[in-house]
Amino acid sequence: MGEKNGDAKTFWMELEDDGKVDFIFEQVQNVLQSLKQKIKDGSATNKEYIQAMILVNEATIINSSTSIKGASQKEVNAQSSDPMPVTQKEQENKSNAFPSTSCENSFPEDCTFLTTENKEILSLEDKVVDFREKDSSSNLSYQSHDCSGACLMKMPLNLKGENPLQLPIKCHFQRRHAKTNSHSSALHVSYKTPCGRSLRNVEEVFRYLLETECNFLFTDNFSFNTYVQLARNYPKQKEVVSDVDISNGVESVPISFCNEIDSRKLPQFKYRKTVWPRAYNLTNFSSMFTDSCDCSEGCIDITKCACLQLTARNAKTSPLSSDKITTGYKYKRLQRQIPTGIYECSLLCKCNRQLCQNRVVQHGPQVRLQVFKTEQKGWGVRCLDDIDRGTFVCIYSGRLLSRANTEKSYGIDENGRDENTMKNIFSKKRKLEVACSDCEVEVLPLGLETHPRTAKTEKCPPKFSNNPKELTVETKYDNISRIQYHSVIRDPESKTAIFQHNGKKMEFVSSESVTPEDNDGFKPPREHLNSKTKGAQKDSSSNHVDEFEDNLLIESDVIDITKYREETPPRSRCNQATTLDNQNIKKAIEVQIQKPQEGRSTACQRQQVFCDEELLSETKNTSSDSLTKFNKGNVFLLDATKEGNVGRFLNHSCCPNLLVQNVFVETHNRNFPLVAFFTNRYVKARTELTWDYGYEAGTVPEKEIFCQCGVNKCRKKIL
């Protein structure tokens, strides 16, 4: 009882410190007046009748065991004469009453007032709900029974935008910290269900959800990490510029934006929740998936689930794998990185999508993220709540391009250089070096990738971007049969990571550079992506063509690939990264899969990924052979310059709290993994989320980019 009183006292002290005590009672009074008027004139809904009855009934029970039902009006007035219990229950029931105070169900003056203070109301609701849930079910005792769907409380009407770890609490679960015995010094977390059953670990949570056939709570909504707090208090700063959801409702959870430093807004870009074109549009359906499962118990048994076996089988072939069997997720959390990728259950699988523990990335982000302005690194991303280790954060999305197109559109010479661009780069070097870092690094004069390594290695000249405002992340693979390695980000000049296995080799090449807008207002010319077929060219950067491409893929689920060959000098065979313009940021991921060959032809095969009107009539004629050729030996860029998701704003850190994991969702074709970010440790609320770009300092002597991550083990330089 003392603990409850302490919680209530803390609740009101916090409101008093914020000067919101008067505000909350004004809101309660408005709610009561609204309910009173509607009951008197008969315009109240059933929900409002019930809310009013519960409010008065519970307020009366505080001082008397006699319910308001059957009591006379005189008794009610007598029992309600003490104002303190009534107001206490009013604030406890405020969270139930507020939803009915919409513009449709309340007085006009109340509606206007609530709209202007909406953020404060929602914040207060969260605090009140947490206190009320704890108070209402703390004395619940467990009685032996077989759990079923009747043990669960009804799901709240709207859970979107909530802390995912708060959802069980809103469904009348209790999260408790306790010692396992009197001699133990460590605290452990346990959950108490609405029916009184104790859940001591995630395995018991899964069994309970399986028994109750729950379809609105999942194992990743529960955390048994004692460091994770469900409602962490942090000082709030004044927002200069903000946005409730930069995804405009595309994501399952709103992605907010907040600038507490200046009035600068996010650069214009098209929000894409996943990669476009979709992988299933670029893959022959007959070879899209190599296996599928029909599990009935959540896909946790590797002896029964074909998808878990596929992940384990590929992981075993990796020279980096351990002797321990790797199955991927453990109850929807990733315990360690799997170089060969995770194969999630697909649309061909017959398992229950809600109970399946091997479906994570395909459900989209669940944690609350916020894009914000950092002090030194430009835009960044932070979490608004505590996140447990192994939690999925987001993917890196964008537009999938054919590198051949980007090279052509930029007019790169055979040596991969642009003399005018190089002059701009070095003339701006000193001026821009101080102002930029991590997510906003100025021009990067380096060879963005190396050539595919053959038995006889030759060096390629570096290629410079003609746009000093971009971030390019690039990954290249030389094919190992049945192996897909993680996209290791390494400096490409001569530091390529090469893995030998079964007489074949795989190399990873990636690089990136980011720049803020120049102080002189320099803006590079905007490049256009061209669709070509049989000599015809169309500008695909226009909104009309963009919309056409989107509609085409949705309606036909088929994409045509145009192929042509172009003779190039031997030196241009070096696969060099091309870059695209961006007002603030450029990120791309390039993947190449090739088999090393003796006496390789000097012809460079170029294929166009995108469709235009002229290709529409040819889509039905696309054969499986042409798709196979498209996947073989081609280079793709995942470009987030103008289109992408929240992942495009993630910064670098030498000690990151995110790891990068390839995940196969829409196809098992190793050309098209989703690049997903998971937490590699517990992350506290309001902490910036970062990943290691993987550069090695000193690889480009002409350019130095200093790191601003500020960790103890900082490498001081990104390049």
UniProtKB/Swiss-Prot annotation:
GO molecular function: DNA binding; histone H3 methyltransferase activity; histone H3K9 methyltransferase activity; histone H3K9 monomethyltransferase activity; zinc ion binding
SUPFAM superfamilies per UniProt: DNA-binding domain, SET domain
Keywords, comma-separated and alphabetical: Cell cycle, Cell division, Chromatin regulator, Chromosome, Developmental protein, Metal-binding, Methyltransferase, Mitosis, Nucleus, S-adenosyl-L-methionine, Transferase, Zinc
Principal location: nucleus
Binding site for Zn(2+) 2: C293, C307, C345, C349
Residues involved in S-adenosyl-L-methionine binding: K377, G378, W379, D418, R648, N651, H652
Coiled coil: none
Biased composition (Polar residues): 72-82, 532-543
Reaction(s) catalysed (UniProt annotation): N(6),N(6)-dimethyl-L-lysyl(9)-[histone H3] + S-adenosyl-L-methionine = N(6),N(6),N(6)-trimethyl-L-lysyl(9)-[histone H3] + S-adenosyl-L-homocysteine + H(+)
Locations listed in the record: Nucleus; Chromosome
Tissue localization of expression: Ubiquitous. Highest expression in heart, testis and ovary.
Domain Pre-SET: 291-364
Biased composition regions of type Basic and acidic residues, renumbered to the chain: 520-530
Principal EC category: transferase
Domain commentary: In the pre-SET domain, Cys residues bind 3 zinc ions that are arranged in a triangular cluster; some of these Cys residues contribute to the binding of two zinc ions within the cluster.
Family: Belongs to the class V-like SAM-binding methyltransferase superfamily.
Descriptive protein name: Histone-lysine N-methyltransferase SETDB2
Organism, as annotated: Homo sapiens (Human)
